């Protein structure tokens, strides 16, 4: 008998909404769906405070696991036909709870040989995190058969303001009554059911083909802005330098304050300059950039 497992970690509830919509077609087809919510032994706060938010950076980027509560026996004892892994992105890497689960002792027993669909709901940068997820799943022989990456579609700097308001107040409302709501739009969250239908059709055939991801991309399930693709690659390298510098340092608190200042400088001063230079040179690299976008949309997906 077919059975689906949803593995997720969410703070605001947005990812749970995405996952619920994704599995709705399976539920409608009479296929049982189980949920496993990853729980930390020491929970992260939400809303965040400044110290906790920036303090999570080194361990998050370096993918250092922390203690999580054991997967319930009722989940471990069942066989699943498909796993939906819904994850947050923290600092261009999978969130610490997701990393902790994927590096836990129980994960191989639960995921080995199981096809996986990855679901994410982010501000706008998720590609590097997806690559890191794929690397961890590969070690457990769990192929990614589809990827749905929903993002905040508003302008980069507008989404910075709105996401900060959401993260530090816990309120997903219109900041200052002027800006749009933060996060993935309600319309896009609801659209996850469409991608669920696509996956369901292939699951029923028993074969997942590369055409599945192409269909998801064609229907808007993976949107990539070319400039942010380039910016994310550069940011990933710089984050690596900062994370290794801060982790284990006796001057951790001071260095985290420096990193905070660096982020402010990078987002509000350096990024607009880089953006201008990028678009000036864009015509020269159009074909290369187009290939990179297509590759990223298909990234980390393997057929069975």
Please report, for each region that a protein language model flagged, where it lies by residue.
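Helix-loop-strand module that forms the ligand-binding subsite of alpha/beta enzymes
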Residues: 48-144, 148-149, 273
